[in-house]
C-alpha cells in the first residue's frame, strides 16, 4: 500500500504484493517495472501521486503495515492493499512490478504484480501510481496490410478482433464477495489456507497502476507487464494484424479416435509474399513524428528480444525447432500439449458499495452513486486502462472477459483449439491479476489451469512463423510467471509457490549467466552491441532480484524467519539502492517475533546508511523505526511522540497519523484518537479513505457508543462518492 504522505511500509507475505519509464531511455524503461514495492497498498488515489514519490516509494511503504500494527482488530490479518496495477510491458513498466516489500509489522508483503514487466506490471498492479504509458493500441490489428494474393487452400489466421467488436451490454446481477485485510500487529505473517467469508483478509497489492505520473517506482509493475501492447508490434510483425494472411491454416486438427488429436502446423512455403507496400506505410504511421523510423523500429525490436527472452523446456524446444525447420507437410503436436484457455465464469461482478447503499440508505441515495462499468467505456485496451485507473477493478474483470470472448477464448471455450497473440496473453494476465487483487483466488486458479506451467509451444512466437516472422521468445509476460508462482500461497500451498519460484529463478540465473559470458539469452552466439548487452544484464538482474523477493515473502508466510531474512539480504545485492528499506523491513520482522535487540541492531544499521543520504525521507525512516521500536515495547507515549514528530515534518503522512491515533487509544484517550482519525478522513477523503484507516475508525465508533451505525453509514456515503467498485466494504463493519 502506498501512503501518499510519504509513509513507509514493509513487505507482507500475503499479497502478490495481484497487474507503468521514460528515456534515456531504454534503461529507464527496463527498470521502473523492476522496482521492489515494499507493500503495495496505497492510502491515496492516483490523483494524489506525484512523480517525486517515485524516488522514495519503498521507504514510504515500509511503514504502511506498522501503521496497522497495533490495530484494534477482530481479525488477525493486517495489510494495506490499495495499489496500482502498473503497465504491462517490461520496457514500459515503472519501477517495480508491484512487488512487495517488508511490511511495517515485520511482514514483507509481495506486491504484485504482477516484476511487473508492465502495467498493472509483469500490472502489472508499487509505488508511484500512474498508468505507465498510454500505449494502448487503438488501431485494430486486423487493419494491417493484406497480402496481394492467397493460395486457394489458405485460411485466415485467427486474429484478435477486440477492437472492432463490441460485446452486448450485460446487466449486473450481483457481485463476487471479496476479502479484505484487517490491520493487526502480528497477523500479517500467519499462513492460513482460506479465511472464512466474514473475516477481513489481506489481498495482494497491485501497486502503482493507477497514478497519472509517468515516473514512479512500484512493484506493481513487477506484477504486471503493461497490458497495453506496443504499437511497434507491427514493425517486427507487419502482418500480425492482417485479417486474412496469405499463409495456410496454421492449425488443422485431424480427428483421430482413441488418441489425442494432433495439430498440424503447415510449412511456410505456402505463404504468399505480400505484394503491396502497405507494411511500410503502416510503419510510417506508427512512427509519425520520428526523425528516424527505421532506427526506432530496430530499437523496439531489440527491446522485444530482451523482454521476451525465455528458455523453453526440452519437449517444447523440440516442437519449436521442428516448426522452424519444416520444409513440407506439417508439424504434428498433440492437442494435450497446447494451451486452450477459456473463461470459467461469466457472471457480472457488480458493485458491493451500491448494494450496501440500497440496504442501509435506500434507493434514492444509491441512485446518486455513479461509477464506470464495462458498458460505459470503449471496448478495447483504452477502456480497460480507464476502468483500472478509476479503481473499478470488478468492471475491468468483466471487460477483460468480453475482449477475450471476442478473441475466441470466452466462456465455454476452455479445451478448444485456439491461437494466441500478444493481445490475448496481456488480457489474460490483467484479468488474472485483477482476480488475485480482488481476493478471488479460487477463480484465478481455475482460469490459470489451462496454461499449465506456461511452457507449451503455442505460447512462443516461434510457433507462429507466419504471424510473427523472425520474432522469438515467450508471449507470456514475466510478471504473469511471477503471479502464477505466487498464487498458490494464497490458496494455502506455500511450498508449491516456493517450488515454482525456484524454477523461475533457475531460468533467470541461466539467462543471466549466458549474458555475462558474452552469449545471447538462449546461449547462442550474439551480435548485440555492448550497450544492449549491459541493458539486458541489468534487466535480468532486476528480474532475478524480483524472484528472490517473492521467495522471501513466501518463506515469511511459512514462518521460516531465518531463511526469509537470508533471502531479504540477498535481495540487497540486486537492489542496493533499496538497502535502507530492506533493512527496516528485516528489523520489523524481528519486532514481530519479539526479538527487540535484533530489531534495534537493524534500525541502527538503517540510521548509518541514511546518514549518507540527504533529504526528508531518510529522517522520516529513522523516526518511524524508532516509533515502531517503542510500539513493540508497549511504550505508547514515546511512540506517540515520534509519530507526532514525523507529522510535524510531513503533515500528510498517513502511516504516522494512523499509528498516532492508535497510540492515543492505548493511552486511554479515545476521544482524542477519534478526533485525529476523523480530521484525517475529512481533510482529504480521496487520500485517507483507506481500508485500514476506516477499519480502525469504525472499531473506535463501536468502543465509543452502542449507536455507532449512523456514523458508519456516514462513512459509507463518503466512500460511495470517492471509491470505485473494488472497495472492500467489510472494513465498514456494516454487515
Curated annotation (Swiss-Prot):
Q: Where on the chain is Phosphoserine found, per UniProt?
A: 109, 184
**Keywords from the named record:** Deafness, Disease variant, ER-Golgi transport, Nucleus, Phosphoprotein, Repeat, TPR repeat, Transport
One Gene Ontology BP term is: endoplasmic reticulum to Golgi vesicle-mediated transport
Renumbered residue ranges of the record's region Disordered:
1-204, 237-276
Q: Where is the composition biased (Pro residues)?
A: 13-22
Q: Which disease is it linked to?
A: Encephalopathy, progressive, early-onset, with brain atrophy and spasticity: An autosomal recessive, progressive encephalopathy characterized by central nervous system atrophy and dysfunction, spasticity, microcephaly, global developmental delay, and hearing loss.
Query: Could you tell me where the Acidic residues compositional bias lies?
Result: 34-50
GO cellular component, alphabetical, reads: cytoplasm; cytosol; endoplasmic reticulum-Golgi intermediate compartment; Golgi apparatus; kinetochore; nucleoplasm; nucleus; TRAPP complex
Where would I find the TPR repeats? 545-578, 580-613, 620-653, 654-687
Instruction: Provide the primary localization.
Output: endoplasmic reticulum
Q: What is this protein called?
A: Trafficking protein particle complex subunit 12
Q: What does this protein do?
A: Component of the TRAPP complex, which is involved in endoplasmic reticulum to Golgi apparatus trafficking at a very early stage. Also plays a role in chromosome congression, kinetochore assembly and stability and controls the recruitment of CENPE to the kinetochores.
Q: Spell out the subcellular localization from the entry.
A: Endoplasmic reticulum-Golgi intermediate compartment; Nucleus
Per the record, the domain of life is: Eukaryota
Q: How does it assemble?
A: Component of the multisubunit TRAPP (transport protein particle) complex, which includes at least TRAPPC2, TRAPPC2L, TRAPPC3, TRAPPC3L, TRAPPC4, TRAPPC5, TRAPPC8, TRAPPC9, TRAPPC10, TRAPPC11 and TRAPPC12. Interacts with CENPE.
Post-translational modifications: Phosphorylated as the cells enter mitosis but is dephosphorylated at or before the onset of anaphase. The phosphorylated form recruits CENPE to kinetochores more efficiently than the non-phosphorylated form.
For this protein, the record's Pfam families field holds:
TPR_19, TPR_6
* SUPFAM superfamilies, A to Z: TPR-like
